[in-house]
From Swiss-Prot:
GO terms for biological process: defense response to bacterium; killing of cells of another organism. Expressed by the skin glands. This is Brevinin-2. InterPro entries: Antimicrobial_frog_2. Shows antibacterial activity against representative Gram-negative and Gram-positive bacterial species, and a very high hemolytic activity. The keyword Disulfide bond applies. Pfam families: Antimicrobial_2 (PF08023). Keywords: Amphibian defense peptide, Antibiotic, Antimicrobial, Cytolysis, Disulfide bond, Hemolysis, Secreted. Its main location: secreted. The lineage of its organism: Eukaryota, Metazoa, Chordata, Craniata, Vertebrata. It comes from Pelophylax porosus brevipodus (Nagoya Daruma pond frog). GO terms for cellular component: extracellular region. Disulfide bonds join 27-33.
Length: 33
């Protein structure tokens, strides 16, 4: 239902945010930003 699709959207958005944070952190550590 609607709640399930909202949950799926939140999970997908959360993954995207986590991945961008991780890539930003790793490039800063490696000084490749």
């Amino acid at each position: 239902g609607l709640l399930d699709s909202l949950k799926g959207f939140a999970a997908t958005a959360g993954k995207g945010v986590l991945q961008s944070l991780l890539s930003t952190a790793s490039c800063k550590l490696a000084k490749t930003c």
